[in-house]
Amino acid sequence: MTKSKVKISKKMAEAEVRTFLEAHYIDVDTEDMEKEEASETNAIIAALARPIQKGRATIDGKKYTLELLEPQGDLKEVSFEGMSFHALTHSSRAKAGDNMAMEGQVVAAMCKITYAELCKMPIQDFMVLNNLKKVFMSA
């Protein structure tokens, strides 16, 4: 586990992300993937590792915790412990044809926060959480 506010190398952070994803039964062996899929997987792993490198995120077993850039009252961090069917069904609550709202509903549900809380986050925080959604949805 990476301790908060401790900066680590890119390689170590990416290794933590790979271990986290493997713990959730997500294949991260890019040697067996098509070139385009491997490139996309590596880009997502790098994006998820960046907050770890900067000490803003931690991984503890099967839990990824992101410290928010702009805390919202008591909400100072958001944790993700895996994707559930419940998170997927949240997208149906969004208006038909509004892809961003559908993605936001899924991200909010997977992090167990409200859609309103998600909407108040800086785009940088949303993009980290959206990358988690992408990798879990593609599994």
Where are these regions (language model features)?
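A hydrophobic, small-residue-rich beta->alpha segment in the mid-to-C-terminal subdomain
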Residues: H86-M110
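Charged interaction scaffolds used for protein-protein
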Residues: M1-E77, G82-R93, A116, M121-A139
